[in-house]
Each structure stands twice: as C-alpha cells, then as structure tokens.
Amino acid sequence: MPHQIYIESAEGPYLTDLDGNQYIDLTCGFGPNVVGNRAQPVEEALASQIKKGWHFGIPGAEQARLAELIKESSPAVDEVMFCNSGSEATMFAFRAARALTGKRVVALFDGSYHGIHDYALVKASNKSDRSEPTSSTLGAGIPEEISKDLMMMLPYRDENAYELIRKHKDDLALVVIEPVQSSNPRLDNQQFLDGLRAVCTECDVLLMFDEVITGFRIEYGGCQQYYNIEPDLVTYGKAAGGGMPIGVVAGSKRVMNTFSGADDTPTIFAGGTFNGHPLTMAAGIAILEHLKKNQEEIYPYLHEQGNRIASEINEFCTSNNIPAQMMNAGSMMHLIFSGEEIQSSRDISHSLYKVEKEFYLHLLGHNVIVPGIHLAFISYAHKPEIVDQVIDAFKKSFEDLREDGYL
C-alpha cells in the first residue's frame, strides 16, 4: 500500500476515500453496522436528537428505552448498565464478578479477545500445554502478577476446560467466553457451550458471554438466542449503539446489584462522563427497534449470504489447491491461510503471513476493503449482486497471488 487510506464518506455497502475511490466495505465499522453504512433510522434519530441537545450529564428517558430493548432481547438480562466501549463493559463486568463472589480469578479462553484493559490483555503462552494453557500478558506495561495471579486461561473447544474449572472453582469468580470467537468464527459450538454452562452451574462459578461483537449480529438475541443458553453476565457493544460508541454490562439482578448496592450487595465503583450519551442512546434505540421489527428478514439473509461467501471461496481454494479457508459465523468471517483443520486459535499458523499481507493488498486493488485485523463482516446492505462482486474479488486476488509466485 503506497499510503494510508482515509475515508471521506460511507453509504450502504460502500466506503469512499479522500481520492474518490469507492470500495465494497467488509469492515462494517468493525462490526456495528449490521444494516449498512448511514442506516436511515439511525441518521434520522441522530438528527432529531442533535436538535434537542447532545450532552447533558443527567439521565434521560432514552436510557430507559434502550435498556428495555436490551432486556427484551434476552431472558438472561434483568438489568443494564451503560458505558462507552466494549473494553469498559468487560472491565466493569470482571469487577462486578469479583465483588459479588469475593473471589479473585477470572478465566478467559485461548484465542479470545475482550478489550484493551489490563485484565483483558492476557493470552495463552504459545509454548504451554494446549489442554492446560498458562497465562502471559499481551504487550508491555502490564504487571506480570495480573496474568500469573489474577487471570487464568482455559482451552477453547476442549473439554479439559471443564476439569480446570472444577479444579480452580474455589478461586474462580468468573468464566468469560466469546460464544463465537472473533479469531475463529464458527457456529458449531453448541455442545461445548452447553457443557460450559453446566459445569459453571455445578461449581457455582459465574458465566459471562462477551457478546460485544456477536450481540445483535448473529441473531437479534445474539448467541444467547442462537444457542438457547442463559449466562449470568453479558457484555454488549458495537451493534447495540448503532455505530455510536457504546458498552453495555447486563445480567441477572443478583450480579447487577453490585452496581447499585441493592440487597446489601458489595458495591463497585462505576461511572463515566459520557455513559448513556444522548446521541448513542438515540442511535441504539433506532437500530434495535429496526432490527427487532425486521429480524425475520435480516438475520436469515445475513446467514445465507455469509455462508454463500464462505462456501464459494472454500470450494475455489480446494479446487485450486490454495492453502486457505474461509471460516464464518453467519455474517462475520475470517480468511485463514492454512489448509489444516482448525479447532482453535492454536491451529492457526502465521507462517504464511507474507502471503496473507499480499492477498489483502490485491483485494484492495479489486476495490474490496477488509479491516487490518482481517475479521470481515457483511451487512444487510450487501445485496446478492454485491456479494457476487466480493466473491469474484477474492478469487481474482488468489489468482493474482499465483501469478506473483506466492502460491
């Protein structure tokens, strides 16, 4: 890439840069734009709210309405707390679980992503046992004691995770999982998640679904609806704000009492100047009401087209002996350069990183843009003819790699 791309405008399935180049957008704002860029209900709601004012510091009726919509979407949710990002949401959720249980350790799964605060930037050590991973910090500036003493890693899609929870139940405040991992998007997780819910109940350990990415995208009710599982805590972000900054902590009254101190529950400190921001509330209400009303049309379409992209690209790679595979969970997808079977992030090799980098440069040349993390999304605005163009661009980019000698 000769220089960084800067976006000037967006409309439906497209982004346009400062030079006037138009791209099919597979970023979707890193996931929030479920119905496309500049969704009309959101644009109208924002315009209306701006006329009334855009920051008050005092709660308004819009907070109650958005909270009610989120509650209605999930039987696991009794109460809701708003913040400004998915990272803030997971940070507050970890704190709430520790306060309620009096226990210190929070468990995450290998390959997961839960934000940018210190307790989330913990990963499985690459050289550790796959079925019993040890923890290390991700990036500098995070005390080692966090990964060693306050966090633990569990193996993803591995039943030994259940035994580790049983072994450490007296120290475990919370088990956190992306029900569909962003690094490994797939939907065949029912059996593993059912087992996880059962063992957490057995061991009296709180279970949290991090639905920052999947909430209101996999289904209107997120992965909770798709798998019919009720966690104790849920975090939301992205789509819940209609493209405006948002984080949401939600869950059972027992856990959420830690935010209010009700029923003599230990109370955590939580707050923020922009929590429940009027523009975010307006956008969130508009998009959730739209998604709720049209869910029987929107979500089957997103699954159908996401599956079509993955199926056609995987068939092309197999028939042309290309070591790559498209993994997808409905409308979220990740092209992984590996011909091996993938069960967890441990199976993803980075040996073809240079090939992967060149691929996305070629894809950009075919006017399709994917975020730098290579987790791609489509929206309801990506109609079948747009999806056809996406598939064609992927195929042409693979052919470009072969011509360049990378494959």
Language-model segments: which ranges?
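Conserved N-terminal phosphate-binding loop of PLP-dependent enzymes in the Aspartate aminotransferase
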Residues: 1-407
